[in-house]
Regions:
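Bacterial N-terminal signal peptides
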Residues: 9-20
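Compositionally biased, intrinsically disordered low-complexity regions
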Residues: 18-22, 182-184
Length: 197
């Protein structure tokens, strides 16, 4: 009998914690109905690099600097509350204009710990907007770690203009869109591109 009561009590506690977690990620709309908050994550690869300066850790090229300014113009009105970058000159420089505009200090993450970054974003920034600058081999795995399906199969070495957006809410599948930004983007509007595996 005691084990039955303990099991019931454990289930009630877990259920209560689950409801509390759901309530923490819900907001009340003007009509009085609770709605899930949407977490928005913008992901971009660093802008064009100047490989003639330092092959191991290059700075941005002139075109890359133009793209970094375009990123600032595009995302400053989205009011991000957190910015994430890897610890390279090119990713930091891509994020620098936006960071200055929104007065946020970029947080450095380990590109080998993508899952940990996704967990941190979900836990610490639920219902908010964040920006992540990464690399051609880290963005798609991060989209997957956030629960989405990458809209492209790969990012080639000469592709710098993708702006991925992942929107997540409790109880809903993430919505992933992609658009181009900066000089001569290939995609000009948010385009949901479902990819069949």
């Amino acid at each position: 009998m005691n084990s039955f009561l303990n099991t019931c009590l454990s289930l009630l506690i877990c259920f209560g914690l689950g409801l509390g977690s759901f309530a923490a990620q819900a907001q009340v709309a003007p009509d009085g109905k609770a709605r899930s908050m949407v977490t928005t994550v913008y992901l971009v690869r660093h802008a064009e690099k100047d490989s003639t300066t330092d092959r191991a850790d290059p700075m941005l090229s002139a075109l890359g600097q133009v793209r970094a300014q375009a990123l600032r113009q595009l995302l400053v009105r989205r009011h991000p509350v957190a910015l994430f970058t890897t610890d390279t000159k090119r990713t930091r420089a891509t994020l620098a204009p936006l960071a200055e505009a929104v007065k946020l200090e970029p947080q450095v993450y380990d590109p080998k710990e993508i899952t940990a970054l996704a967990v941190r974003i979900r836990q610490e920034y639920a219902g908010k907007t964040v920006v992540v600058v990464g690399h051609s081999n880290t963005l798609l795995p991060l989209i997957e770690s956030l629960g989405g399906t990458p809209p492209v199969e790969s990012i080639s070495d000469n592709e710098y203009d993708y702006l991925f957006t992942v929107r997540t809410a409790v109880g809903s599948l993430p919505i992933v869109t992609v658009r181009g930004y900066g000089p001569e983007p290939k995609l000009t509007a948010d385009t949901p591109v479902p990819r069949i595996r």
